[in-house]
C-alpha cells in the first residue's frame, strides 16, 4: 500500500447453484489464496453465495437462511486476514428481497449495498424476485441479520444498508471505494458516478453478466470508459462456471481498470482470478487537477476501516518509455497524428503571419530533422513549394562531417532552399570583442555559438519575410538544456511538447513511410548519430560532446518527467518505479544520480520555460507557461532534493 498502490483482485469461484455451503467453501479457499498474495481488496461475483441463477428458489426461506449462515462462515474463516472481501448474496429487508453486496473485514460486515437497477428485459427477470433500491438514505441494518444461527445477537452482521456507502481507510484516505452491481453500470446514470464524486477512488462491480457474441467487447468498453470518466479504479467481477446453463452461459469475465487503462483482464471461461495494483495516489492527483470533477453533495455515508500499511510488491506493467504506446501499430498511429498536429499548428501560424518563408537551423541531429519534416508537411498543407523553407546549416568548432553531410542530404531530398553560413569567424570576432580566450572551452565558448546561430536565423527571417522555427524538444526544456536566448528562442517551436524518446520514433516512422530513397537513408543515419549540441571541438572528426554523458540518459529523464510531472509522484515514488521499470538496465546508484540531476535542473531552469515561444501541445505533458505548467522561476527544490538525499 506504500506510495498509494493497493493490490486488488477480482475472483470467480466455481459454484453450485443453491449450495451455499459449497459456495462459501470455494469463496474462502480463493480468498485465502489471494490473502497470501498480499491482496488488500478482493471482489467476488454478484450473488456468488447462492448463485445468480436460482430463479424462484430466491423466495425460499431455506435458501435465504443458507446464505446468511454462509456469510457467517466466511466472516469467521477470513477474520484473521488483513483483506477486505466483498461477496454477493440475497437479503431480506422490510419484507422485500434485495440483491446485495456485503463488504467484510476482520470478521465483521462493514456494509451492505443493494442493487439499484434491475434488468427485466430479454433473458433477465430480476424484478420477479428482487426489489430495486430506491436510492433513499442509508440505514443501519438491525433486522433480519441481527441474530446468529442459534438466535443469539450477532453484532458482526449489523452494518449500514444502502447504495450510498463509501468505504474509506483511516490511515490512507485515498484508499476509498464504492459499489455498484452489474446492471447499475449499464444504466443511464450509474451509481458509481455520484460515488466517485463523493470521494470513492475505486469502484467495485459485482456482476453476473451472461456471455453472448460481441458482449465481452461492449462490457470491456463500459468498464474502461466509466473508469476514465470517473478518474477511478474499477474492479469488475462476473459470475462464471457453476451457474445454471439452462438458458445462459457465464464466462467469468474479470477486469481491473484504472482511469481508462486495463491493468488486468481474465480470459473468458477461465474461472480464475486477476490481480493488479491500483494507484490511488495517481487518481487523487488527477482529480485534484480536474476542475470538472466536483462534489455534488449526494446523500452518502462513509464507513471507516483500518488496514496495516505495508509495502506492496508491484506486478503491474510500468513502461520504461511512457510517452510511447505499447504496440508498434499504436505507435505508428500516434506518430502519424503527432506529425499532423505539428504541421497543422505551423500551417496556421505561417498563414496568420503571412510569412513568406519558414527559416530553420539544420544541424543533422534529431530535433532539427523533425522540425524540418514538420515544415515540409506544413508547406504541403498550404500548397506552397518546398523552396519556401529556408534551411540554414551553420558549421563551427564542433561540427562533424557526418552531421553536416546528413543535414545537406535531407535538405536536398526535400528540395528546400539551403544556405550554408560558417559562423567560425563571427564567433572568433565576438570572442575578441568581449575579451574571451578562444582556448577557454567554458560555457561562454559554447553559448556564444548558440546565440550566434540564433542571431543569423532571426536576421534571415527578417531578410526573407519569414518565421524562425524552433527545434528544441520537451526533454531539453525540462532539463533547461538550451542556451538562454540561443536555441531556446524562436518564433514558433514545433517540438516543444515532444520528448526526446518520442522524437526518435517520429523520425523513424517518417523514414519507414517515405518513398524518397535519399531522405530515408539520411534519416536512418541520423537515428544512429549520438545526441550532441556539437559546441565543443570534434576529436579526430568524431563528436566529442555527447549530451547523455553530461546530463544523463534521456530515457531516464523522460521517465522522471512523465511520472514526476504528469502524475505528481514524489521523488521517492518515481525512484521506486524507475528501479522496477529499469531493472537490469541501470543500477540503483545510476538512477539516483540522474534523478537528483533531473530535479535540480528542473527547478533551476524554470526561468527559461517562463519565456517560452509559442508551440503546439500534442500530449498530456507540456511545460508551456501559458498552459499546463505554471511555476515561479525562483521556487525552491529543497523538499524534493532532501527526499532524494534520504534515499541514499
Predicted segments, located by residue:
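Enzyme catalytic cores with a strong preference for nitrogen-chemistry domains
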Residues: 1-359, 377-386, 418
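ATP/NTP-dependent adenylation/nucleotidyl-transfer catalytic domains that generate, transfer
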Residues: 173-175, 232, 244, 258, ...
Amino acid at each position: 500500500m506504500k506510495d498509494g498502490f493497493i493490490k486488488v483482485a477480482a475472483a470467480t469461484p466455481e459454484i453450485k447453484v443453491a449450495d451455499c455451503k459449497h459456495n462459501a467453501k470455494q469463496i474462502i479457499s480463493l480468498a485465502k489464496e489471494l490473502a497470501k498474495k498480499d491482496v488488500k481488496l478482493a471482489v467476488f461475483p454478484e450473488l456468488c453465495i447462492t448463485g445468480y441463477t436460482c430463479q424462484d428458489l430466491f423466495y425460499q426461506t431455506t435458501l435465504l437462511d443458507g446464505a446468511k449462515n454462509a456469510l457467517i462462515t466466511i466472516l469467521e474463516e477470513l477474520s484473521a486476514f488483513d483483506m477486505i472481501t466483498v461477496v454477493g448474496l440475497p437479503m431480506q429487508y422490510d419484507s422485500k428481497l434485495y440483491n446485495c453486496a456485503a463488504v467484510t473485514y476482520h470478521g465483521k460486515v462493514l456494509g451492505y449495498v443493494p442493487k439499484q437497477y434491475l434488468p427485466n428485459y430479454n433473458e433477465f427477470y430480476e424484478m420477479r424476485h428482487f426489489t430495486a433500491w430506491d436510492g433513499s438514505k442509508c440505514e443501519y441494518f438491525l433486522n433480519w441479520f441481527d441474530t446468529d444461527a442459534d438466535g443469539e445477537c450477532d453484532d458482526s452482521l449489523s452494518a449500514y444498508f444502502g447504495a450510498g456507502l463509501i468505504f474509506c481507510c483511516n490511515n490512507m484516505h485515498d484508499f476509498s471505494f464504492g459499489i455498484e452491481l452489474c446492471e447499475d453500470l449499464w444504466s443511464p446514470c450509474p451509481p458509481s458516478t455520484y460515488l466517485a464524486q463523493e470521494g470513492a477512488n475505486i469502484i467495485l462491480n459485482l456482476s453476473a453478466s451472461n456471455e453472448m457474441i460481441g458482449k465481452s467487447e461492449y462490457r470491456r468498453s463500459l468498464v474502461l470508459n466509466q473508469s476514465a470518466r470517473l478518474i477511478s479504479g474499477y474492479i469488475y467481477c462476473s459470475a462464471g462456471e457453476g451457474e445454471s446453463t439452462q438458458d445462459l452461459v457465464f464466462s467469468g469475465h474479470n477486469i481491473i481498470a484504472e482511469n481508462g487503462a486495463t491493468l488486468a483482464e481474465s480470459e473468458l471461461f477461465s474461472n480464475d482470478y486477476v490481480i493488479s495494483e491500483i494507484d490511488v495516489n495517481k487518481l487523487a492527483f488527477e482529480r485534484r487537477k480536474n476542475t470538472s470533477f466536483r462534489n455534488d453533495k449526494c446523500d452518502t455515508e462513509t464507513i471507516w476501516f483500518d488496514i496495516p500499511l505495508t509495502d506492496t510488491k508491484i506486478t503491474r506493467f510500468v513502461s520504461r518509455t511512457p510517452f510511447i504506446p505499447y504496440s508498434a501499430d499504436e505507435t505508428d498511429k500516434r506518430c502519424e497524428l503527432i506529425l499532423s498536429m505539428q504541421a497543422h499548428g505551423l500551417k496556421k501560424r505561417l498563414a496568420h503571419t503571412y510569412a513568406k518563408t519558414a527559416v530553420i537551423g539544420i544541424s543533422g541531429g534529431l530535433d532539427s530533422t523533425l522540425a524540418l519534416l514538420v515544415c515540409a508537411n506544413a508547406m504541403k498543407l498550404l500548397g506552397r513549394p518546398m523552396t519556401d523553407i529556408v534551411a540554414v546549416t551553420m558549421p563551427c568548432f564542433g561540427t562533424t562531417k557526418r552531421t553536416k553531410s546528413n543535414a545537406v542530404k535531407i535538405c536536398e531530398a526535400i528540395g528546400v532552399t539551403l544556405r550554408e553560413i560558417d559562423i567560425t569567424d563571427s564567433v572568433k570576432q565576438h570572442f575578441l570583442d568581449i575579451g574571451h580566450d578562444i582556448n577557454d572551452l567554458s560555457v561562454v565558448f559554447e553559448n556564444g555559438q548558440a546565440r550566434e546561430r540564433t542571431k543569423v536565423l532571426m536576421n534571415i527571417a527578417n531578410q526573407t519575410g519569414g518565421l524562425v522555427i524552433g527545434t528544441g524538444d520537451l526533454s531539453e526544456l525540462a532539463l533547461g538544456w538550451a542556451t538562454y536566448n540561443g536555441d531556446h528562442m524562436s518564433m514558433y517551436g514545433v517540438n516543444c511538447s515532444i520528448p526526446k524518446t518520442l522524437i526518435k520514433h517520429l523520425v523513424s516512422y517518417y523514414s519507414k513511410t517515405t518513398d524518397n530513397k535519399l531522405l530515408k537513408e539520411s534519416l536512418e543515419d541520423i537515428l544512429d548519430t549520438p545526441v550532441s549540441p556539437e559546441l565543443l571541438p570534434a576529436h579526430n572528426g568524431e563528436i566529442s560532446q555527447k549530451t547523455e554523458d553530461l546530463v544523463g540518459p534521456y530515457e531516464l529523464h523522460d521517465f522522471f518527467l512523465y511520472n514526476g510531472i504528469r502524475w505528481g509522484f514524489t521523488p521517492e515514488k518515481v525512484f521506486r518505479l524507475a528501479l522496477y521499470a529499469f531493472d537490469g538496465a541501470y543500477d540503483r546508484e545510476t538512477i539516483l544520480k540522474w534523478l537528483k540531476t533531473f530535479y535540480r535542473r528542473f527547478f533551476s531552469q524554470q526561468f527559461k520555460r517562463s519565456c517560452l515561444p509559442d508551440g503546439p501541445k500534442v500530449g498530456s505533458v507540456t511545460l508551456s507557461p501559458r498552459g499546463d505548467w505554471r511555476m515561479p522561476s525562483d521556487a525552491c527544490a529543497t523538499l524534493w532534493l532532501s527526499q532524494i538525499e534520504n534515499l541514499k
